[in-house]
Amino acid sequence: WCKKNCFPGKWPNRFRDSWERVLQFNKEKKFDMYQEEVMVPVGDWSKSRLKNLSETDKKRDPSKVQSGFGKNVSNWVGRDMVYPTNVLHLATECSNRKHSAAFPESLPEWFIKLFTKEGDVVLDPFLGSGTTAVVAKRMQRKYVGIDLLDENIEVSEERLLDS
């Protein structure tokens, strides 16, 4: 995920950390994915870019690598919402100050929407301060959290009681 407002840093030999890798796992090879739950607005670019489509834009372009996939630009006409990209752009703002690797609730919320329905189980093997569990509870999912540090478990239990 891309941190829109990452913390400033003053290091002599590296840049600020403005992105972080997010890992998501499923138990099964075949799993449900509810992409409609995380669709995003197309944006204003579509109005000008799709205004005057040529005839070649209205038919599928063959893939340059022979993958069988190509693009049909006219499929974008009239759409208000589209599937998101594979980079989440989120602000780092969060009210949790009890853990060094805190992240906004919108981060686990996006994944919970994408891969689960109400009543499903969300596992967080790095519980930390419990943000994922708090969001899962709010979204009517069951949750399991694992952490090595007792103080993290205490903080997350406190947050879950308050939520």
Model-derived regions, located:
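Core catalytic lobe of class I
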Residues: W1-L161
